Each structure stands twice: as C-alpha cells, then as structure tokens.
C-alpha cells in the first residue's frame, strides 16, 4: 500500500503540467486561522526549515507539498522520475544525480534541484511576491514543491492561507471572503483529507477550522483535528479533555503537537531537537497519551489515512480518467489534423456541406433536432399547416356586401335594365376575390426561403464541425448558398404570381365541380321561388282585380286559401311551360325579346316567370324609390354622382344577390383548392429542388479555385491553440491511465 502515495504524486505532476484541475486527487489539506501553527506542523512533518515564518499573514498562496520517501542507501540522488512514463512537461532529466540526502524541486523552475532548504524558503517567498505582491495580498494560484528525503513518509499536503477577519496592508476589503472561498475550493474535494489545526490556548468551541470543515464534511469522515501549542496553555490548565474528544469529538481523532516558538526559530533550534523536546514534554504532561500524540504519530496517522483514502478513491479515479481521455480524443478529432492537401480538403468540405444540406431537407441528416422542426419537416409544416390554414381563413365573400354586388350587376348591364343576372358581374366579383389568394401564396414562398436560410446555420453548427476550423471558408459557403437562394426567390415568386394570374385569366363556368354546384343551386332557388309564389301570389292577384280599391285600404296580410294555392300552382306550371316552349322554339315571349349574347348561359338557372314579375311589380308600387333622389325644395344637379340609398331589397334583388354570392363561394372554393395544391408544387420545383440539384456545382464553381485555396483554408487564430491544448491534455490523461494501469491489485491491501 505504500506504493499508492507515489502513484498519486505522479498523477499530480502529470496534471500540473497542463494546468488542469479536472481530476480531484486525494491529498491532505491543512486549514486553520492565521498564526495557529499550520506551517509549523508541515515543517515538523518534513523535518526541515523550509517554509516562510513570521508574524501576521505569511502563507499568501496555496502550497502543494509532496513528500517523497527515498532509501538512505541510494547514493545517486535524482528526481526519482527517470523511468516514469508520465513526466513533467518538457522535462530534460539530468544525467547525473545530486550528492545530498535531502533535496527539493519546484514545478515552476523545471529541473532545477535545491539542496539548501534556506534557498527553498527564499524561492517560496520570491514566487509568492511575484504573484501576490510584496505586501499582504493573497492569490489562489498554487506553488508546487516536491521534497525528497529518507526522513519523511509519503504524503501530499496543501498549506493554505490562514483565515482572517480584518484586512491589512494592500489586502482588499473582502479578504475574509476570498480566503474562505479559496479554502472551500480545496476542502470541497471529496477525495481530500482535512487537517483542521487549532491552537491549544484558544477555546476549541470557537475553532474556525472545525467550523468550516463541518460545512463540507458534516459526518466528519475525512476530518482530523490537530491541537498545536500545547506548551503555551495557561498555568493550571491542560488539554486532556480536548485530546480525549470529550469537548468536541472528531471521528478520525485529535492529535496534539508542540511547535517551535519564534524564539527557538531565532536561536536556530533544529526540527530534530524540537521533536525530541516535544516527546519529553508529552511524557511529562500527558504520559497516558504520549504514544498517541506528537509529530511522529501525526505523520504515521496521516500516511495511513491517505493510503486508505487513495484505495477507496482509486476505482472512481480510473473511470474518470478513462472517460476524460475518450472525450478529449473526440474533441481532438473534431479539430482535425493540420491540412496537407488543401485542394482535396476544400473539395471534401464543400461536398460534405452540400450533402448535409440536402440530407437535412430530405430528413436523413446525421444530427436531427429534437426540440423543434427543422429542414424538410418544417417546409412540410409550412405547406400543409401554415399555408393551408391561412387559405382556409380567407372568407370567400370577404370585403363584399349586398350593395357591392348590386352595383356590380347594374354596372355590367350598362344603360339597359337587365332581366337576368349578367355573367360579367359574376366574373368581375369572383376575380376580385381570387386576387386575395396571391398574398398568402407569396408569403408561403417567403417562409420556405427563410427556412432554407436556417438550414445553412443548422448545418454549420451541428453537421460540419470541420467548418469551424476555417471561418473564411464557412463565410464563403454561406454567401454562395445565400446568393443562390436569393436568385431563385424572384423566379419562384413569378411562378406563384402566374398561378394566380392563370386562375384570373379564364373563369371556367363549365368546370365539373362548378356545374354540379350550379345545378344544386338552380334546384334550390327554383324550389324557394315556388314556395314564395305559392304564399304571395293570391294576394297580389286579388289586389290586381280590385284595382279600384285604394291600396291603403287593402288588408295588411291575407292567408291564401287552398283554392287560391291550387290556382297559383296552375298558373305557375302554365307559365313555366310557356317559357320553356319559347326558349326551345326561339320565338315570341319575354325571354326571346330581351336575350343578350352575354347572358344566354344563365337563362336555365335564372328563369323568371311572369307571375314573379307581377309580384315584384306589386311590391314596388307602394314605395317608389329613385337612386340618389334629392330632398324636397332642392334643385336636381345631373352632374352629381349617384349615392346609394339604404332600402329594403325587392324579391328579385334578393334572389340576384343570393345567386351571385353562392356562385362566388362555389367557384372561389374550387380556385382555392387549386392554389393550395399548385403553390407547394411550384415552390418545391423552382426553389427547393433546384437548390438541391445545383448546390454542389454552384459551390465548386464559385470556391474551388487554386487562387482561393490558401485564403479559404486559413484556420482561426485560436484553433491551433485549442488543438495543442487538447493534444496536451490527451497526452496527460493517457499517461495517467498508464500509471494507474501499472498498479497491482496487491498494492491495495
């Protein structure tokens, strides 16, 4: 098990070379208040004076101290890493050793070896001032120091700045918060052991070290308490209850030590002498606890705790390193290798982008969105949901009222009163309604164009990671595709405009669907006319027979008798037969007298009997209405524009409006169905499919030129740096994986 700590030290070195903190390695973190004796405990464990000492805040940067045990008989003292597969970055190992029993090495000084521990202390001070300044500033950047000695056990310790309350010197006002966050960053590592240092001449219940330790380790499974300055307690008091755990119990134990005083340091008292005096003090003051306290016992305890902790953390550490190695390998692959054949690389990237673009439209892309519709699926949604619902929301009679229809009918007849509804009025009104379908159709083209623009960004972000290496090539491809889409937009709009113009060019009243609708409406209108005449004709006939009676004396309403109804039906049948005969023979009759070429097609559907004309005439007699009639007392100006007057429509006007409305609605639905079917087809042919078919040839023609190779395949400034960082991290992870793989299972027990 002793071999586990050097393994962790090697892993620490490997990851320090790349400045990575992604792997949390097992280590011992020393925490405590300022001047509580943290650095003195570390020096006692090392057995040499190597840390800066003094009053106030001395430790101003984290110090990661690795203690490496070497055999005393080893005459050739080196870094101990000549045969290690994982070595420090750019390390050139010395061919000769160092003739000294103990030596140190800093990570930031590369291969320089220090045999003078005063020089080590001076280098710590210099490195601290280089980053933290020469006053009282604190920095979170750690200093890495490795000590080789036959007098130490294998340990990895972290000395942190002491907790303080009031800023001094050039320290910021929030120095307490900064140091607290720094300590929490190290002790929050679940693979660390917390060494909580508290001075014996203070109340343990007020220990800041134990308080902050419990925040991250409430169960105390990885916290060991150290009581320093046992020789400085008030006379008549001792730390027996504290060391026995009766005041505050600590699961891993409480160990007391005696530090060198500042006077001892000034008198150059060695650590060896200090440890000997410590043992004598413990035998005298705490004889029953002497064998479970002191610096030597603390070192052995820490070594044992660290080894067991490493054993527990090792399986998870192996898994973590393997996962990270796979991730960085994938990341490095996405960055690609340096370009050798630029011509082949350019053609490959162009082809891949064109393929991914077309696949995104077809729905066979490698990277498929799950949060929203994109590509061909969104185009389908635009066709059948957005465009379809928009067309269905267009009212066939929107913008038309009864006055508009009557005005169109009158304008279509010219100066002659019309007996039938002119076909010209129907065409005029239905074309006006069909024209309203053009705007949503053009909007459909615009939406598809926008989606095809979005596909460019989708392919750049998800499908072709290689393009991120070459930002100029990426911009050039986007520009070419955008120009291609922009060129196809007017062509597609023109085709959609023509589709609507085609419908406007010829109103096909012989359309099969429209003929069926006309037949149904003819039967419906004929039936309504029969019913209306059956109710109203008897009263009109009676008023005609008694024409000498003033109309004002006629009854307001009269129910038709059965005899009158039979008479009305007989007259209606005779009238219909007479009209049919006249229409077939072409002679005599009202229809023959007023027939016009433009209205012949409507006669079968808009037949008007004499009885109905008589009824309309009777209805119009009581209320003679002139359009735009002047008020009494005013002169009539023939140059005035006629103003429509609101009035109750006659039966014929109601019938004409109803016929026109139904015909417009029927024909509009036919045209809308045609537009809903033909516009998506036109968009697919003139825009989507054309871009798919010509995209690659357009890209090759515009970009595949020898004069553009060097410029287009210029990598971004940070791409080379990111590739190098990923390669270094991958190398470190592979080295760490090799180190862990060399651990024998027997080492764990």
From Swiss-Prot:
Question: Where does the record place the GED domain?
Answer: 657-748
Q: What is this entry's stated membrane topology?
A: Peripheral membrane protein
Q: Which PROSITE patterns match?
A: G_DYNAMIN_1, G_DYNAMIN_2, GED
Q: Which residues carry this modification: S-nitrosocysteine?
A: 657
Could you mention a single GO BP entry for this protein? Answer: peroxisome fission
Record cross-link Glycyl lysine isopeptide (Lys-Gly) (interchain with G-Cter in SUMO), residues: 545, 548, 571, 581, 607, 610, 619, 621
GO terms assigned for molecular function: GTP binding; GTP-dependent protein binding; GTPase activity; identical protein binding; lipid binding; microtubule binding; protein homodimerization activity; small GTPase binding
Residues found modified as N6-acetyllysine: 610
Q: Where does GTP bind?
A: 32-40, 228-234, 259-262
Entry's Gene Ontology cellular component terms:
brush border; clathrin-coated pit; cytoplasm; cytosol; endoplasmic reticulum; Golgi apparatus; membrane; microtubule
Give me the reactions it catalyses: GTP + H2O = GDP + phosphate + H(+)
Main subcellular localisation:
cytoplasm
Q: What is its EC number?
A: 3.6.5.5
Q: Has the keyword Ubl conjugation been applied to this entry? A: yes
Q: Which residues form the Dynamin-type G domain?
A: 22-315
What does the PTM comment of the record read? Phosphorylation/dephosphorylation events on two sites near the GED domain regulate mitochondrial fission. Phosphorylation on Ser-650 by CAMK1 and PKA inhibits the GTPase activity, leading to a defect in mitochondrial fission promoting mitochondrial elongation. Dephosphorylated on this site by PPP3CA which promotes mitochondrial fission. Phosphorylation on Ser-629 by CDK1 and PINK1 activates the GTPase activity and promotes mitochondrial fission. Phosphorylated in a circadian manner at Ser-650. Sumoylated on various lysine residues within the B domain, probably by MUL1. Sumoylation positively regulates mitochondrial fission. Desumoylated by SENP5 during G2/M transition of mitosis. Appears to be linked to its catalytic activity.
Is Glycoprotein there in the keyword field? yes
Cite the residue spans of the region called G1 motif.
32-39
Q: Where is this region: Disordered?
A: 74-93, 536-604
- Glycosylation (residues): 598-599
Which PANTHER family does the entry mention? DYNAMIN, DYNAMIN-1-LIKE PROTEIN
Assembly, in brief, is: Homotetramer; dimerizes through the N-terminal GTP-middle region of one molecule binding to the GED domain of another DNM1L molecule. Oligomerizes in a GTP-dependent manner to form membrane-associated tubules with a spiral pattern. Interacts with GSK3B and MARCHF5. Interacts (via the GTPase and B domains) with UBE2I; the interaction promotes sumoylation of DNM1L, mainly in its B domain. Interacts with PPP3CA; the interaction dephosphorylates DNM1L and regulates its transition to mitochondria.
Q: What is this protein called?
A: Dynamin-1-like protein
Q: Which organism is it from?
A: Bos taurus (Bovine)
Name the gene.
DNM1L
């Amino acid at each position: 098990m002793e071999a586990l700590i050097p393994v962790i030290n090697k892993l620490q070195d490997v990851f320090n070379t790349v400045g990575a903190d992604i792997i949390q390695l097992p280590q011992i973190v020393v925490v405590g208040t300022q001047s509580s004796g943290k650095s003195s405990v570390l020096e006692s464990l090392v057995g040499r004076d190597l840390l800066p000492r003094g009053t106030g805040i001395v430790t101003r940067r984290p110090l990661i101290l690795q203690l490496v045990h070497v055999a005393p008989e080893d005459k050739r003292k080196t870094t101990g890493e000549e045969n290690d597969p994982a070595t420090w970055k750019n390390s050139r190992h010395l061919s000769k050793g160092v003739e000294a029993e103990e030596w140190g090495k800093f990570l930031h000084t590369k291969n320089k070896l220090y045999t003078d521990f005063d020089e080590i202390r001076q280098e710590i001070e210099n490195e601290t001032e280089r980053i933290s300044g020469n006053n009282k500033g604190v920095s979170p950047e750690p200093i890495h120091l490795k000590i080789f000695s036959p007098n130490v056990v294998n340990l990895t310790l972290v000395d942190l700045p002491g907790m303080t309350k009031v800023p001094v010197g050039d320290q910021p006002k929030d120095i307490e918060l900064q140091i607290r966050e720094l300590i929490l960053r190290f002790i929050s590592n679940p693979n660390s052991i917390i060494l909580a240092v508290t001075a014996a001449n203070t109340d343990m219940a007020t220990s800041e070290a134990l308080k902050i330790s419990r925040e991250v380790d409430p169960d105390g499974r990885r916290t060991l308490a150290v009581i320093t300055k046992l020789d400085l307690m008030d006379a008549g008091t001792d730390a027996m209850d504290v060391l026995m755990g009766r005041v505050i119990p600590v699961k891993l134990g409480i160990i007391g030590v005696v530090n060198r005083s500042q006077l001892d340091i000034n008198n150059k008292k060695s650590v060896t002498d200090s440890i000997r005096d410590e043992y004598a003090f413990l035998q005298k003051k705490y004889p029953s606890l002497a064998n479970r306290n002191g610096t030597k016992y603390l070192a052995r305890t820490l070594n044992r705790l660290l080894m067991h902790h490493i054993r527990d953390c090792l399986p998870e550490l192996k898994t973590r390193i393997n996962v990270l190695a796979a991730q960085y390998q994938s990341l490095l692959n996405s960055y690609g290798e340096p370009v050798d054949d630029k011509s082949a690389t350019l053609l490959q990237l162009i082809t891949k982008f064109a393929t991914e673009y077309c696949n995104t439209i077809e729905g066979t892309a490698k990277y498929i969105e799950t949060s929203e519709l994109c590509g061909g699926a969104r185009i389908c949604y635009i066709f059948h949901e957005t465009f379809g619902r928009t067309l269905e929301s267009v009212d066939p009679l929107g913008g038309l009222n009864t006055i508009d229809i009557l005005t169109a009918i009158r304008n279509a007849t010219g100066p002659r009163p019309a007996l039938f509804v002119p076909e010209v009025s129907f065409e005029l009104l239905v074309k006006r309604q069909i024209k309203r379908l053009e705007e949503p159709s053009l909007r459909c083209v615009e939406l598809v164009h926008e989606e095809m623009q979005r596909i460019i960004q989708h392919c750049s972000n998800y499908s072709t990671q290689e393009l991120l290496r070459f930002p100029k090539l990426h911009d050039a491809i986007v520009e070419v595709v955008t120009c291609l889409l922009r060129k196809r937009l007017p062509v597609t709009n023109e085709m959609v405009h023509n589709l609507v113009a085609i419908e406007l060019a010829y109103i096909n009243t012989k359309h099969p669907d429209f003929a069926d609708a006309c037949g149904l409406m003819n039967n419906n209108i004929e039936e309504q006319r029969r019913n209306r005449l059956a109710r109203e004709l008897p009263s009109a006939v009676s008023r005609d027979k008694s024409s000498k009676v003033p109309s004002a004396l006629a009854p307001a309403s009269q129910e038709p008798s059965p005899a009158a109804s039979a008479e009305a039906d007989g007259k209606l049948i005779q009238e219909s037969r007479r009209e049919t005969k006249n229409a077939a023979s072409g002679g005599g009759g009202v229809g023959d007298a007023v027939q016009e070429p433009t209205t012949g097609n409507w006669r079968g559907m808009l037949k008007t009997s004499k009885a109905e004309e008589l009824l309309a005439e009777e209805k119009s007699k009581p209320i003679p209405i002139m359009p735009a009639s002047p008020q009494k007392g005013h002169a009539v100006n023939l140059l005035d524009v006629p103003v429509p007057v609101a009035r109750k429509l006659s039966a014929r006007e109601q019938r004409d409006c109803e016929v026109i409305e139904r015909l417009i609605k029927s024909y509009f639905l036919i045209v809308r169905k045609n537009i809903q079917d033909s516009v998506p087809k036109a968009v697919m042919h003139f825009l989507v499919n054309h871009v798919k078919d010509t995209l690659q040839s357009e890209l090759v023609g515009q970009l595949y030129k020898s004069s553009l190779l060097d410029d287009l395949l210029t990598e971004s400034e940070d791409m080379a740096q990111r590739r190098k960082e990923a390669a270094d991290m991958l190398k470190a992870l592979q080295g760490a994986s090799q180190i862990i793989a060399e651990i024998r299972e027997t080492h764990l027990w």
